Amino acid sequence: MPIRIDSRNADFVPRFKAFLATKREVSADIEAATRAIVDDVAARGDAALIEATCKFDRLSVDAAGLRFTAAEIDAAVAACDAATLDALKLARDRIETFHRRQLPKDDRFIDALGVELGSRWTAIEAVGLYVPGGSAAYPSSVLMNAVPAMVAGVARVVMVVPSPAGRINPLVLAAARLGGVSEIYRVGGAQAVAALAYGTATIAPVAKIVGPGNAYVAAAKRQVFGKVGIDMIAGPSEVLVIADQTGNAGWIAADLLAQAEHDANAQSILITDSEALAADVERAVETQLATLPRAGIARASWNDFGAVILVTDLDEAVVLADSIAAEHLEIMTADPEGLAARIRNAGAIFLGPHTPEAIGDYVGGSNHVLPTARSARFSSGLGVLDFMKRTSILKCGPDQLRALGPAAMTLGKAEGLDAHARSVGVRLN
């Protein structure tokens, strides 16, 4: 059964703190093994990549076969169900519309001294997109990563996706084409991350790597950070639902299970000021589990990491929600807009009973690549700015240099950097 915490109980604070500290990923120390793979690919390139692909994916391939051909992608698209392709196109179009509104504008102005200042935005030249492989790979995630890069103007988007024993979900290749991916390679794991970061004879290096993966992929992204940029280190998914007595227990239960079926380590949380609703939701979860195809995974998630938190009022719910800083936050109350305005920490907020988080996963338009494990306290979901960089611009004429130069020289000398002061002074003399 999920944990039950009641803010009216004397032990609430320590129990809530323990709940926040719960670790949902238990893995052996894989840093050394990952480092060996990364270093090998950095040193030996294609040879190491091909060996690792044979070992881990049971796929024999040569350098020429690492890249999916246009004919293979055409065949994959042709194999896809027409209705599913139409749904992917709808998702692509809505994701593009939402993300185009994030495009920043260059800025240039002249201050009171006549100094010109500004900022210029440019797209990252090349980005790598990691996609988990196998038949369960998610084409929606391809769109969520690729479309913002396309909108940002990234010239080269490279996708890597493992194809264990040669198997791949054709929808993943179809989504890549719809999302504007430039190149697709049948490699995965830490070796694929290393290839993107360091480059091989076949795969040219990129400047940034985005996309989710297993513990080895996460470790590899940590290890190559600095050589390239990365988006985030994603943990198991999570949803928090805040509801009052107006909430529909069956709908809330369905949303909690939609998150729980992702992964046995996923987390579904309900905060409510209604004890009756809490009981109804718990019963509805059990009823719906009985008919869920992925019931084993969902039940493990709900029993091990699920939580029902009772509060005296919604003011308490706001405080707790900010502490949890959930990846997904659904608000099903009489005034969801008013409550949302008071919450600072959440990856994405879904307002009202007719906005299930699953709509955001697929066709809402907002991005479903979101900060997990309380990192919404300091980070945001994936967006256009993750694929762009800002360059500042400064221009002084002779008059402006004369006005600012003496102060710059004073500060340079104060810091013991005489050459700094001199580089200004030679222009003033």
From Swiss-Prot:
Q: Which residues bind Zn(2+)?
A: 259, 262, 361, 420
Q: Where are the transmembrane segments?
A: none
Matches recorded under Gene3D superfamilies: 1.20.5.1300, Nitrogenase molybdenum iron protein domain (3.40.50.1980)
What organism is recorded for this protein? Nitrobacter winogradskyi (strain ATCC 25391 / DSM 10237 / CIP 104748 / NCIMB 11846 / Nb-255)
Q: What is this protein called?
A: Histidinol dehydrogenase
What's a single GO MF annotation on this record?
A: NAD binding
Task: List residues binding substrate.
Answer: 237, 259, 262, 328, 361, 415, 420
Question: What InterPro entries does this protein's entry cite?
Answer: Ald_DH/histidinol_DH (IPR016161), Histidinol_DH_CS (IPR001692), Histidinol_DH_monofunct (IPR022695), Hstdl_DH (IPR012131)
Secreted listed as a keyword: no
- Top EC class per UniProt? oxidoreductase
